[in-house]
Amino acid sequence: NGLDYTVNEVTTAVGAKQAIASAMMVIAGPGDEVLLPIPCWVSYTEMIRLAGATPVFVPVRQDNYELDLDAIRAAITPRTKAIVICTPNNPTGAVYSEKSLRELADLAVKHDFFIVADEIYEKMVYDGAKHFSVASISREVWERTITVNGFSKAYAMTGWRIGYAAARADVIKGIMAVQSQTT
């Protein structure tokens, strides 16, 4: 995906779900808000709440399930700590365009919030669609992105909970600290 990480910038997890939940505990807490484009996978909401943060639901465009950047802009507050995106999306199957991800990245840099990029379905693209990793845009975006992936979907290994998170070293260190006390 055009991404480079050192050994200190990656951690394994008991599935991508655990990686996302651990990341939430590191980057968000009471009083914080995490943007969540909807419809979305049901577990994101509870992971945000378990971290003590508040999910802020942001509708996607109804014509193609693409990110609605105007709605995202309107939802950003000084308490916004992150946005969780899943592309290709669960449950819609929408593959967010490079253009919309670049616009989202600009917002993350401007307002200094994280992008939690769930890329578990990256290999499941059809009809000429192309997956694009938001962290590949620039170093500034890479530093604000936690890329999460795993092997269960692409390799039909759903019973094998093998996931990982990739991010800057201080975030990964925090995720590993959470994992050391929860697994």
Regions inferred by a protein language model and the residue ranges of each:
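Phosphate-binding glycine-rich loop
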Residues: N1-E33, A169
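Aromatic/hydrophobic pocket-lining residues that form π-stacking "cages" and hydrophobic walls in ligand
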Residues: Y44, L104, V134
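Substrate-binding/gating loop at the entrance of the active-site cleft, primarily
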Residues: V14-Q18, S22-M25, L35-A53
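Helix C-cap/helix->beta junction micro-motif
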Residues: A51, K110-H111, V141
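Conserved core segment of the aminotransferase class I/II
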Residues: R139-T183
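Short beta->alpha connector loops at strand-helix junctions that form conserved
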Residues: I38, F57-R61
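Active-site phosphate-binding strand-loop segment of PLP-dependent enzymes
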Residues: V60-D127
